[in-house]
From Swiss-Prot:
It is found in: Cytoplasm. CDD domains: DHQS (cd08195). The keyword Cytoplasm applies. It catalyses: 7-phospho-2-dehydro-3-deoxy-D-arabino-heptonate = 3-dehydroquinate + phosphate. Pathway: Metabolic intermediate biosynthesis; chorismate biosynthesis; chorismate from D-erythrose 4-phosphate and phosphoenolpyruvate: step 2/7. NCBIfam families: aroB (TIGR01357). Keywords: Amino-acid biosynthesis, Aromatic amino acid biosynthesis, Cobalt, Cytoplasm, Lyase, Metal-binding, NAD, Nucleotide-binding, Zinc. Catalyzes the conversion of 3-deoxy-D-arabino-heptulosonate 7-phosphate (DAHP) to dehydroquinate (DHQ). This is 3-dehydroquinate synthase. The gene is aroB. GO terms for cellular component: cytoplasm.
Amino acid sequence: MISKLSVNPTFSPSYNIIVDSVLDFSHILEYVTNKQVLVVTNTTVAKLYLTKFLAALVDDLDVRTCILEDGEQYKSQQSLDKILSTLLENHFTRNSTVLVALGGGVIGDITGFAAAIYQRGIDFIQIPTTLLSQVDSSVGGKTAINHQLGKNMIGAFYQPKVVYTSIEFYKTLPQREYIAGMAEVVKYAFISKDFYLWLDSNRDKILAKDSVTLIEMVKRSCQIKAQVVAMDEKELTGARAILNFGHTFGHAIEKCQNYRGLKHGEAVGVGMAQAIDFSHYLGLISQQQAKDFNDFIVSFGISIDFPNDICQKEFLEAMLLDKKNSNKELKFILIENIGSLSLQKQSKNELEQFLDISR
């Protein structure tokens, strides 16, 4: 069973997202029109899927691999340099090269950024292997590496040639990673009331990993993101900002833990709860709404407990570095109801007071 949908960005060519019930890498062959292929993956995914992927490629291709360490802390300049050096050392050229990102969000982000900047742009293909990367980072063209002062601070908007994935990847995906991915899925429920109701009615099947339901879940999540990206590919109008619900707080958590604590999806889960509570503090939603929204997050096995190893001063400093901020104004994606999120400016003092009473 294959589900296919199209992403139509504002400034870039359209591309397909292919969600497969089985794992058949041959589906990407029609998109490998270049003769030089560099497969970027990590040590974990390489052991599980690299051999099978390489076996699916035709014999007349010049195929090389670049295997990075696994973890958010390796979404770095050093890892980027390793990819670029591999391309240069093997004389890969702009018009004959395609990069393949075989892995989760870190691999997709860093490979996409390498594709964006190598010889001013080469083709790349996304093969996301985690739920989080399937529904979020592989779609929409955001590519980046982290800096020691902030997450995703160095990057570019650059769309893939195609996204191919399969729910078969879940067979080797640790439960913790699966639940982390569910945080991004739940985020879309706060953006779309229809999806909120669908998730609510299919919760048991989702937690039981029913294959038909999971394919539909991934497809619906990608559709919501694709619709937003089509309106505001490069965050010029502000429409795309709603996709960052939970991320302002979440990114700050990751930064404070040096990307070695909560996983990205876990941090987003906590971040959504923080954004919900901040919305209540500001009078945008009632206490009952805040409870209902947080209970919805928790019902999918997602923790909303704030880490106790982060001090408030450090957390506040990390939030001040958020990319949405401008002219020293803090910007947050806040909630007024299901399907009603908005980008709002708040003062540093308002945030400090909220953090004081919420700890």
